[in-house]
Amino acid sequence: MAKMGKKYSESIKLIDKNSLYTPSEAIDLTLKTAKAKFDETIELSIRLGVDPRHADQQVRGAVVLPHGTGKKVRVLVFAKGDKAKEAEAAGADYVGAEEYLDKIQKENWFDFDVVVATPDMMGVVGRLGRVLGPKGLMPNPKSGTVTFDVAKAIADIKAGKVEYRLDKTAIIHVPIGKKSFGEEKLAENYNVLMEAIVKAKPAAAKGQYIKSLSISSTMGPGVKINPAKVLA
Protein backbone atom coordinates (compact mmCIF):
# COMPACT_ATOMS: atom_id res chain seq x y z
CA MET A 1 0.00 0.00 0.00
CA ALA A 2 2.88 2.36 0.80
CA LYS A 3 4.26 1.89 -2.70
CA MET A 4 0.88 2.66 -4.25
CA GLY A 5 0.60 5.69 -1.96
CA LYS A 6 3.92 6.97 -3.24
CA LYS A 7 2.82 6.57 -6.86
CA TYR A 8 -0.44 8.38 -6.09
CA SER A 9 1.47 11.24 -4.43
CA GLU A 10 3.70 11.54 -7.48
CA SER A 11 0.64 11.58 -9.75
CA ILE A 12 -1.05 14.32 -7.73
CA LYS A 13 1.93 16.62 -8.34
CA LEU A 14 1.22 16.56 -12.09
CA ILE A 15 -2.27 17.97 -11.61
CA ASP A 16 -3.26 21.50 -10.62
CA LYS A 17 -6.34 21.03 -8.42
CA ASN A 18 -7.47 24.58 -9.15
CA SER A 19 -7.35 24.20 -12.93
CA LEU A 20 -10.04 23.12 -15.36
CA TYR A 21 -8.49 21.28 -18.27
CA THR A 22 -9.62 20.73 -21.84
CA PRO A 23 -10.75 17.14 -22.53
CA SER A 24 -7.53 16.42 -24.46
CA GLU A 25 -5.35 17.77 -21.66
CA ALA A 26 -7.33 15.83 -19.06
CA ILE A 27 -7.05 12.55 -20.97
CA ASP A 28 -3.30 13.08 -21.40
CA LEU A 29 -2.85 13.76 -17.66
CA THR A 30 -5.00 10.76 -16.75
CA LEU A 31 -2.79 8.48 -18.83
CA LYS A 32 0.36 9.97 -17.28
CA THR A 33 -0.98 9.39 -13.76
CA ALA A 34 -2.17 5.81 -14.41
CA LYS A 35 0.80 4.09 -12.83
CA ALA A 36 -0.66 0.74 -11.71
CA LYS A 37 0.83 -2.47 -13.10
CA PHE A 38 -2.50 -3.57 -14.60
CA ASP A 39 -4.42 -2.03 -17.51
CA GLU A 40 -6.44 0.57 -15.63
CA THR A 41 -9.99 1.50 -16.62
CA ILE A 42 -10.53 5.15 -17.55
CA GLU A 43 -13.80 6.53 -16.19
CA LEU A 44 -15.78 9.73 -16.52
CA SER A 45 -17.81 11.26 -13.69
CA ILE A 46 -20.34 13.88 -14.82
CA ARG A 47 -22.45 15.96 -12.43
CA LEU A 48 -25.58 17.32 -14.09
CA GLY A 49 -27.77 20.27 -13.19
CA VAL A 50 -30.93 18.19 -12.85
CA ASP A 51 -32.97 16.84 -9.95
CA PRO A 52 -33.08 13.03 -10.17
CA ARG A 53 -36.08 12.99 -7.80
CA HIS A 54 -38.24 14.28 -10.65
CA ALA A 55 -39.26 11.86 -13.41
CA ASP A 56 -39.06 14.59 -16.07
CA GLN A 57 -35.42 15.28 -15.21
CA GLN A 58 -34.08 11.76 -15.53
CA VAL A 59 -31.11 11.22 -17.83
CA ARG A 60 -30.70 7.66 -19.02
CA GLY A 61 -29.67 6.02 -22.25
CA ALA A 62 -27.01 4.01 -24.03
CA VAL A 63 -24.42 4.62 -26.69
CA VAL A 64 -22.00 2.42 -28.65
CA LEU A 65 -18.43 3.59 -28.06
CA PRO A 66 -16.41 3.34 -31.29
CA HIS A 67 -13.58 1.49 -29.54
CA GLY A 68 -15.59 -0.30 -26.88
CA THR A 69 -14.60 -0.34 -23.21
CA GLY A 70 -11.93 -3.02 -23.31
CA LYS A 71 -14.02 -5.24 -21.09
CA LYS A 72 -15.50 -8.59 -22.08
CA VAL A 73 -19.22 -8.18 -21.42
CA ARG A 74 -21.32 -11.18 -20.39
CA VAL A 75 -24.90 -10.96 -21.69
CA LEU A 76 -27.91 -12.74 -20.20
CA VAL A 77 -30.96 -12.85 -22.48
CA PHE A 78 -34.49 -13.68 -21.36
CA ALA A 79 -36.23 -15.08 -24.43
CA LYS A 80 -38.08 -18.15 -25.69
CA GLY A 81 -38.51 -20.01 -28.96
CA ASP A 82 -37.09 -18.44 -32.09
CA LYS A 83 -35.89 -15.38 -30.18
CA ALA A 84 -33.89 -17.61 -27.85
CA LYS A 85 -32.26 -19.29 -30.86
CA GLU A 86 -31.57 -15.85 -32.36
CA ALA A 87 -29.90 -14.74 -29.12
CA GLU A 88 -27.72 -17.85 -29.00
CA ALA A 89 -26.67 -17.35 -32.62
CA ALA A 90 -25.83 -13.71 -31.91
CA GLY A 91 -23.37 -14.67 -29.18
CA ALA A 92 -25.31 -14.24 -25.94
CA ASP A 93 -23.52 -15.86 -23.01
CA TYR A 94 -26.69 -17.12 -21.34
CA VAL A 95 -30.17 -17.55 -22.84
CA GLY A 96 -33.30 -18.78 -21.09
CA ALA A 97 -36.39 -17.88 -19.12
CA GLU A 98 -37.75 -19.13 -15.80
CA GLU A 99 -34.66 -21.26 -15.14
CA TYR A 100 -32.55 -18.09 -14.86
CA LEU A 101 -35.20 -16.45 -12.69
CA ASP A 102 -34.80 -19.35 -10.26
CA LYS A 103 -31.00 -19.33 -10.52
CA ILE A 104 -30.82 -15.64 -9.63
CA GLN A 105 -33.40 -15.84 -6.83
CA LYS A 106 -32.25 -19.09 -5.23
CA GLU A 107 -28.52 -19.12 -5.92
CA ASN A 108 -27.84 -15.37 -5.83
CA TRP A 109 -26.22 -15.82 -9.27
CA PHE A 110 -24.91 -12.71 -10.98
CA ASP A 111 -22.25 -13.93 -13.42
CA PHE A 112 -23.41 -11.46 -16.10
CA ASP A 113 -22.96 -7.77 -16.88
CA VAL A 114 -26.01 -6.90 -19.00
CA VAL A 115 -29.55 -8.27 -19.18
CA VAL A 116 -31.58 -8.21 -22.40
CA ALA A 117 -35.22 -9.28 -22.54
CA THR A 118 -37.89 -9.58 -25.20
CA PRO A 119 -41.00 -7.56 -24.25
CA ASP A 120 -43.07 -10.71 -23.69
CA MET A 121 -40.57 -11.84 -21.04
CA MET A 122 -40.84 -8.72 -18.88
CA GLY A 123 -43.49 -10.40 -16.73
CA VAL A 124 -40.80 -12.85 -15.66
CA VAL A 125 -37.96 -10.33 -15.49
CA GLY A 126 -40.13 -7.89 -13.54
CA ARG A 127 -40.12 -10.32 -10.63
CA LEU A 128 -36.38 -9.69 -10.38
CA GLY A 129 -36.76 -5.93 -10.10
CA ARG A 130 -35.72 -5.80 -6.45
CA VAL A 131 -32.41 -7.54 -7.11
CA LEU A 132 -31.60 -6.32 -10.63
CA GLY A 133 -32.68 -2.70 -10.12
CA PRO A 134 -30.18 -1.71 -7.40
CA LYS A 135 -27.36 -3.26 -9.44
CA GLY A 136 -28.33 -1.30 -12.55
CA LEU A 137 -29.09 -4.54 -14.40
CA MET A 138 -32.82 -4.16 -15.03
CA PRO A 139 -33.61 -4.19 -18.79
CA ASN A 140 -35.04 -0.91 -20.06
CA PRO A 141 -36.50 0.13 -23.44
CA LYS A 142 -34.58 3.45 -23.32
CA SER A 143 -31.27 1.62 -23.25
CA GLY A 144 -32.36 -0.82 -25.95
CA THR A 145 -32.31 -3.84 -23.65
CA VAL A 146 -36.05 -4.55 -23.88
CA THR A 147 -36.51 -5.47 -27.54
CA PHE A 148 -37.53 -8.17 -29.97
CA ASP A 149 -34.41 -7.39 -32.01
CA VAL A 150 -32.18 -9.36 -29.66
CA ALA A 151 -29.49 -9.93 -32.29
CA LYS A 152 -28.88 -6.18 -32.70
CA ALA A 153 -29.00 -5.60 -28.95
CA ILE A 154 -26.36 -8.28 -28.36
CA ALA A 155 -24.19 -7.05 -31.24
CA ASP A 156 -24.27 -3.48 -29.90
CA ILE A 157 -23.41 -4.60 -26.37
CA LYS A 158 -20.54 -6.78 -27.53
CA ALA A 159 -19.28 -3.96 -29.76
CA GLY A 160 -18.92 -1.59 -26.81
CA LYS A 161 -22.35 -0.26 -25.91
CA VAL A 162 -22.43 1.43 -22.51
CA GLU A 163 -25.40 2.56 -20.49
CA TYR A 164 -25.46 5.85 -18.63
CA ARG A 165 -27.87 6.87 -15.91
CA LEU A 166 -28.07 9.33 -13.05
CA ASP A 167 -27.39 8.19 -9.53
CA LYS A 168 -29.21 9.75 -6.57
CA THR A 169 -26.74 12.63 -6.44
CA ALA A 170 -27.23 13.56 -10.13
CA ILE A 171 -23.88 12.08 -11.15
CA ILE A 172 -23.23 9.73 -14.07
CA HIS A 173 -20.25 7.35 -13.91
CA VAL A 174 -19.22 5.73 -17.21
CA PRO A 175 -16.07 3.85 -18.31
CA ILE A 176 -14.66 5.02 -21.65
CA GLY A 177 -11.89 2.48 -22.12
CA LYS A 178 -8.55 1.26 -20.83
CA LYS A 179 -5.17 2.93 -20.39
CA SER A 180 -3.85 0.77 -23.25
CA PHE A 181 -6.25 2.47 -25.68
CA GLY A 182 -4.08 5.57 -25.81
CA GLU A 183 -5.13 9.20 -26.06
CA GLU A 184 -6.70 9.15 -29.55
CA LYS A 185 -9.09 6.24 -28.97
CA LEU A 186 -10.06 7.48 -25.52
CA ALA A 187 -10.79 10.94 -26.96
CA GLU A 188 -13.03 9.43 -29.64
CA ASN A 189 -14.93 7.37 -27.06
CA TYR A 190 -15.18 10.43 -24.82
CA ASN A 191 -16.65 12.59 -27.58
CA VAL A 192 -19.28 10.02 -28.58
CA LEU A 193 -20.38 9.61 -24.96
CA MET A 194 -20.52 13.34 -24.21
CA GLU A 195 -22.45 14.09 -27.41
CA ALA A 196 -25.05 11.51 -26.34
CA ILE A 197 -25.35 12.96 -22.84
CA VAL A 198 -25.68 16.52 -24.17
CA LYS A 199 -28.45 15.38 -26.54
CA ALA A 200 -30.19 13.62 -23.64
CA LYS A 201 -30.75 16.89 -21.75
CA PRO A 202 -34.32 16.84 -20.38
CA ALA A 203 -36.63 19.65 -21.48
CA ALA A 204 -37.39 20.28 -17.80
CA ALA A 205 -33.74 20.92 -16.94
CA LYS A 206 -33.07 24.56 -16.12
CA GLY A 207 -29.81 26.47 -15.89
CA GLN A 208 -26.38 24.94 -16.45
CA TYR A 209 -26.79 21.33 -17.60
CA ILE A 210 -23.26 20.02 -17.15
CA LYS A 211 -22.16 21.28 -13.75
CA SER A 212 -18.81 19.52 -13.55
CA LEU A 213 -16.96 16.56 -14.94
CA SER A 214 -13.74 14.74 -14.22
CA ILE A 215 -11.80 11.82 -15.60
CA SER A 216 -9.69 9.32 -13.71
CA SER A 217 -8.00 5.94 -13.96
CA THR A 218 -8.80 3.09 -11.58
CA MET A 219 -6.01 3.97 -9.15
CA GLY A 220 -5.26 7.53 -10.21
CA PRO A 221 -6.51 10.97 -9.12
CA GLY A 222 -9.40 12.77 -10.78
CA VAL A 223 -8.65 15.42 -13.40
CA LYS A 224 -11.24 18.18 -13.74
CA ILE A 225 -12.51 19.10 -17.20
CA ASN A 226 -13.86 22.55 -18.05
CA PRO A 227 -17.66 22.03 -18.33
CA ALA A 228 -17.81 24.91 -20.82
CA LYS A 229 -15.68 22.88 -23.26
CA VAL A 230 -17.01 19.35 -23.01
CA LEU A 231 -15.92 18.06 -26.43
CA ALA A 232 -12.31 17.14 -27.21
From Swiss-Prot:
Keywords, in A-Z order: Repressor, Ribonucleoprotein, Ribosomal protein, RNA-binding, rRNA-binding, Translation regulation, tRNA-binding
Origin superkingdom: Bacteria
Cellular component GO terms, alphabetical: large ribosomal subunit
InterPro entries noted in UniProt: Ribosom_uL1_bac-type, Ribosomal_uL1, Ribosomal_uL1-like, Ribosomal_uL1/biogenesis, Ribosomal_uL1_3-a/b-sand, Ribosomal_uL1_CS
Gene3D superfamilies assigned: 3.30.190.20, 3.40.50.790
Any one Gene Ontology BP term: regulation of translation
Membrane-crossing residue ranges in chain numbering: none
Molecular function GO labels: rRNA binding; structural constituent of ribosome; tRNA binding
Pfam families noted in UniProt: Ribosomal_L1
Listed CDD domains: Ribosomal_L1 (cd00403)
PANTHER family listed in its UniProt record: 54S RIBOSOMAL PROTEIN L1, MITOCHONDRIAL, LARGE RIBOSOMAL SUBUNIT PROTEIN UL1M
Function: Binds directly to 23S rRNA. The L1 stalk is quite mobile in the ribosome, and is involved in E site tRNA release.
Family designation: Belongs to the universal ribosomal protein uL1 family.
Quaternary structure annotation from Swiss-Prot or TrEMBL: Part of the 50S ribosomal subunit.
Name the UniProt record assigns to this protein: Large ribosomal subunit protein uL1
Provenance organism: Clostridium novyi (strain NT)
Gene assigned in the entry: rplA
